[in-house]
A protein has these predicted regions:
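Charged, amphipathic alpha-helical linker segments immediately N-terminal to NTP-binding catalytic cores
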Residues: 290-291
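Long, low-complexity, serine/threonine- and charged-residue-rich intrinsically disordered N-terminal tails
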Residues: 1-250, 254-274, 278, 285
Length: 291
C-alpha cells in the first residue's frame, strides 16, 4: 500500500503517520493489491476501526497492531521508527492511539468519573522471533520478540506511570512527570522564582497508575546448548497483560530491552532492589506485544 514515508527524527511525524495507518489500513485492500485486482477497498473495511468496535464492547484499552500490516502501509515507519526506536517513539504511538479513539469513540476516552483513560499499543507478528540468549546490547530500545518459558511470576502491583509532584518550597504543582522504570522527580520547579530541585511531595490525586507484574522467563529447554546452563530474564508486564502468564507457559514476548541500574529507586509500589555488584546494570524486557 502506498504511503508517504515518515521523517523518523520527529515524534509528531510518527504520531501523524501512525494515526493515518490506524484510520485507513485495510487488509482487504492490501490483498486486492497483491492479487492485481486494482480495487481500492470496495467493502470499506478498515482493520483497526473494526478492532476499536470490539474494544468498546469489551471495555478494552489496548490496540493490537499486526506488524506486517504496518510494513505494508509504510516500511520506513515500521522499521526505522517503530522497530529500531520503539522505546523512543512509544509515547508518540500512544498519543496517536488516544487521538484515534477520540475520533471514532469519544465516549471511550474518559472513565465514568471524568478522568482520562490511558491507551496502549501492542505489536504482534514481528518478522523474527529471537532466542533469549540472542538478545544483546544492540537490541536495547528496539522492538524485539523472543520466545521463552515462564518460571516465576510476581503479584500484581500498581506502577506510577505519570507522577504529579508538589514543590516543598513554594507549593507549585508539576504534573505529568514521566517515570523511566524508576522513581523520577522533576528536574526543577516550574516556578522561576523558586529553583527547587530536591524537595518534592507526590500529589497522588494528579498521578496516573497502571497495573504491573514482573515475570521471570527462562530459555526453552530445546534451545539450551549442550553443557550450558539455561539463561533467564525479567519481563515487565503492564495493564491488560498482567495475570496472563503462568509458570510453565511457553510464550513469545514482544517489547523493548532496557537496562536498569541496580539499586535505583523503583516506581513500583512495594518493590525494592538492593544495591549489589558495585551498582552493575541488569537487563529487563518491557513487554509491548505478543504474550
Amino acid at each position: 500500500m502506498a504511503s508517504a514515508s515518515v521523517a523518523v527524527e520527529g515524534g509528531e511525524d510518527v504520531t501523524r503517520t501512525f494515526l493515518s495507518f490506524l484510520n485507513s489500513f485495510s487488509s482487504e485492500d492490501a490483498n486486492a493489491d497483491a492479487g492485481g485486482e486494482g480495487a481500492e477497498n470496495p467493502s470499506g473495511y478498515r482493520d483497526y476501526v473494526e478492532q476499536l468496535e470490539l474494544m468498546y464492547e469489551r471495555s478494552g484499552t489496548t490496540i493490537y497492531v499486526n506488524f506486517q500490516h504496518l510494513m505494508e502501509f509504510d516500511g520506513v515507519l515500521a522499521h526505522e521508527a517503530v522497530e529500531a526506536n520503539f522505546y523512543k517513539y512509544q509515547p508518540f504511538l500512544r498519543r496517536a492511539a488516544v487521538e484515534f479513539v477520540r475520533q471514532h469513540k469519544p465516549a471511550m476516552v474518559r472513565w465514568d468519573g471524568g478522568k482520562e483513560k490511558e491507551f496502549w499499543v501492542a505489536f504482534v507478528n514481528l518478522p523474527r522471533v529471537h532466542r533469549l540468549r540472542e538478545l544483546k546490547a544492540e537490541n536495547i530500545g528496539q522492538l524485539t520478540s523472543f520466545s521463552g518459558t515462564v518460571t516465576r511470576t510476581s503479584e500484581v502491583r500498581p506502577e506510577l506511570l505519570l507522577g504529579a509532584f508538589r514543590c516543598a518550597e513554594c507549593d507549585t504543582l508539576v504534573p505529568d512527570v514521566e517515570q523511566q522504570c524508576r522513581y523520577t522527580t522533576p528536574a526543577i520547579c516550574l516556578n522561576a522564582q523558586c529553583g527547587n530541585r530536591m524537595k518534592w511531595t507526590l500529589a497522588q490525586d494528579g498521578c496516573k497508575f497502571v497495573d504491573w507484574q514482573r515475570v521471570r522467563v527462562q530459555e526453552n529447554a530445546s534451545e539450551v546448548p549442550a553443557g550450558s546452563l539455561p539463561r533467564s530474564m525479567e519481563v515487565i508486564l503492564r495493564h491488560e497483560a498482567v495475570e496472563e502468564a503462568r509458570a510453565g507457559d511457553k510464550a513469545i514476548f514482544t517489547g523493548s530491552l532496557l537496562v536498569v541500574p541496580e539499586g535505583a529507586p523503583s516506581n513500583m509500589a512495594g518493590d525494592r532492589t538492593e544495591l549489589g555488584g558495585g551498582g552493575l546494570q541488569r537487563f529487563m524486557f518491557l513487554r509491548g506485544g505478543d504474550l
